[in-house]
């Protein structure tokens, strides 16, 4: 199976959104995906892009996605934050994920980053096992905090 890994471009965004939704569905959170193609285009290809991505391609079909941005740690400096990493279900366990993940790791070297960080659901043992093949540390120490846009708007009304 010939797989091409390349930097994502604007015309890939429809396939990217489909993969984002496929991952969200797998994580039982499809109803939480509110991003649109217009949002992705503006945020990734506008004046100040805030994310980048790699795609895995087979016969001109996008079958994998590594979606990332640069995060800054006040303790350690710059890191690649891997927001989404997904391979279409029918292509999993064929080496596509490993190839895409290795190319993502290369970006860390190219950009002189101090590492790569991501989140994985504690019940997603196939993903955890995949990351452990790369000797990744899977932390159980940190809890994630979040405020939604609506919560922020409500708080701002009180200020």
Map each language-model feature to its residues.
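Conserved GNAT acetyl-CoA-binding A-motif
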Residues: 109-119
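Conserved acetyl-CoA-binding loop-helix of GNAT-fold acetyltransferases
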Residues: 93-106, 133
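A short helix-loop-beta-strand connector motif used in the catalytic cores of GNAT acetyltransferases and
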Residues: 44-54
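Conserved GNAT-fold acetyl-CoA-binding loop/helix
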Residues: 17-43
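Conserved beta-strand in the GNAT
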Residues: 55, 61-69
